[in-house]
């Protein structure tokens, strides 16, 4: 406790001279080992090809365009590419992963599988999907999308049962009913294999409700069976509703292996694409920037729901998205958030990114990295810092040595001057 006055004095000095080192609302990185996944707001190729030299289209500083650390596609998102025919192969690797995408699948698109479907279910799917992606990218370096080969021994082909507007679901694939089967009360199987990745994120989906076809109602039932380990993953329809339901998806994390997709009723589904996860790393939280439209369009908060501590830091602007290129591209607030990618930062926390790792007037919550040491401000003008006293002790020693040197020099010159006057 005898050191507390010194701590108070040092903190008071820091505050007096204006060194606050507050957390800043940006995404950043510790070093050069980072990667960003995005959409048109970070798609340098889109700007070059479609809007030459007009970089106001983006929220990303153009200086980062040649970094080789960005995988972005205008009009797309990882979720959209994962499930639908509108595909872009998002691929990237880094110790520190940043996501700024998701806006290209929102309530504004109003997607639902059938005319009596429910877009709310798809927003739920989006949240569950990104939860798995964020959790896994906190412990994996590499993400890419891969095709999943499957073998179905019947003659029926995949059907575009689930579509809305320009979006057509192709993952999982729906295998149509065989021509010689009279109704949907039948068992169907297909083999699929996962190889080449450490782990995979694959969809397992069902219609959770009573599906009507030719005056009959059916309950969906889907399973994946790992033929190597004997583990089975399954979903059965549990709802009795006949309208307002849609395609409920769970996102399984599976190892490499040989699998059997099984349907006991309705149509067989089999995964055709997977998130490929490779190269395990030391746990490093991902950073997610809110991806939303201008208020004139309806957005959702599913990336925020998916981004939870301790595996994810969420960054957002406090104001409406208002772009300078158009209302949905080039917002100053989000450009400011992405500006942190221009420099290294030592510490990440719930409140934001700290630029320096020495001291701060704000105590970092859920800190990660080399973070400043500080405590809560208990009065309006006196932050009480609690940290290792060694730097202060060393500073005191240096100041003491400096004072001694100055005194010695003063005495030397005073004596020397006195001698000169004596001889003069």
UniProtKB/Swiss-Prot annotation:
UniProt-annotated glycosylation sites, renumbered to this chain: 54, 89, 153, 236, 301, 316, 358
Region (Esterase domain 2): 267-379
Signal peptide: 1-16
Keyword hit for Transmembrane helix: yes
Active site residues of this protein: 40 (nucleophile), 326 (charge relay system), 329 (charge relay system)
Top-level class of the enzyme under EC nomenclature: hydrolase
Disulfide bonds, paired cysteine numbers: 44-65, 113-162, 197-276, 205-249, 307-312, 347-371
Membrane protein topology class: Single-pass type I membrane protein
Membrane-spanning intervals of the chain: 393-413
Superkingdom of origin organism: Viruses
EC number, as in UniProt: 3.1.1.53
InterPro entries: Capsid_hemagglutn, HEMA, Hemagglutn-estrase_core, Hemagglutn-estrase_hemagglutn
Topological region Virion surface: 17-392
Modification comment: N-glycosylated in the host RER.
Chain positions covered by the region annotation Receptor binding: 128-266
Keyword Membrane: yes
HAMAP family: BETA_CORONA_HE
Family: Belongs to the influenza type C/coronaviruses hemagglutinin-esterase family.
The protein's name in its UniProt record: Hemagglutinin-esterase
Organism: Porcine hemagglutinating encephalomyelitis virus (strain IAF-404) (HEV)
């Amino acid at each position: 406790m005898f050191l507390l006055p010194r701590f108070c004095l040092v903190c008071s000095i820091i505050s007096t001279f204006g060194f606050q080192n507050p957390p800043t609302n940006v995404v950043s990185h510790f070093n050069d080992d980072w990667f960003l996944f995005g959409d048109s707001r970070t798609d340098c190729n889109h700007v070059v090809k479609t809007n030459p030299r007009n970089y106001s289209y983006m929220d990303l500083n153009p200086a980062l365009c040649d970094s080789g650390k960005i995988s972005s596609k205008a009009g797309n998102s990882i979720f959209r590419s994962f499930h639908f025919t509108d595909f872009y192969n998002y691929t990237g690797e880094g110790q520190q992963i940043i996501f700024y995408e998701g806006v290209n699948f929102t309530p504004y698109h109003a997607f639902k599988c059938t005319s009596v479907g429910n877009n709310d279910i798809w927003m739920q799917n989006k949240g569950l999907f990104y939860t798995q992606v964020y959790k896994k990218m906190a412990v994996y370096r590499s993400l890419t999308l891969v095709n999943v080969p499957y073998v179905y021994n019947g003659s029926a082909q995949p059907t575009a049962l689930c579509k809305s507007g320009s979006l057509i679901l192709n993952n999982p694939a729906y295998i149509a009913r065989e021509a010689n089967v009279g109704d949907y009360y039948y068992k169907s199987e297909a083999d699929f294999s996962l190889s080449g990745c450490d782990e995979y994120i694959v969809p397992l989906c069902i219609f959770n409700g009573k599906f009507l076809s030719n005056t009959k109602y059916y309950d969906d039932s889907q399973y994946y069976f790992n033929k190597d380990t004997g583990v089975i993953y399954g979903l059965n329809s549990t709802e009795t509703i006949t309208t307002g339901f849609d395609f409920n998806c769970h996102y399984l994390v599976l190892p490499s292996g040989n699998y059997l997709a099984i349907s006991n009723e309705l149509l067989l589904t089999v995964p055709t694409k997977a998130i490929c996860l490779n190269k395990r790393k030391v746990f490093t939280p991902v950073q997610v920037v809110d991806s939303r439209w201008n208020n004139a369009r309806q957005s959702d908060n599913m990336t925020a729901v998916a981004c939870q501590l301790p595996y994810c830091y969420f960054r957002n602007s406090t104001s409406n998205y208002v772009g300078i290129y158009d209302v949905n591209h080039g917002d100053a607030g989000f450009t400011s958030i992405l500006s942190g990618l221009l420099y290294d930062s030592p510490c990440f926390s719930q409140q934001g990114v700290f630029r320096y790792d020495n001291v701060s007037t704000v105590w970092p919550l859920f800190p990660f990295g080399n973070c400043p040491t500080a405590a809560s401000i208990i009065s309006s003008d006196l932050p009480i810092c609690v940290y290792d006293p060694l730097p202060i002790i060393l500073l005191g020693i240096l100041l003491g040595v400096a004072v001694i040197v100055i005194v010695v020099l003063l005495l030397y010159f005073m004596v020397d001057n006195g001698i000169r006057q004596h001889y003069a």
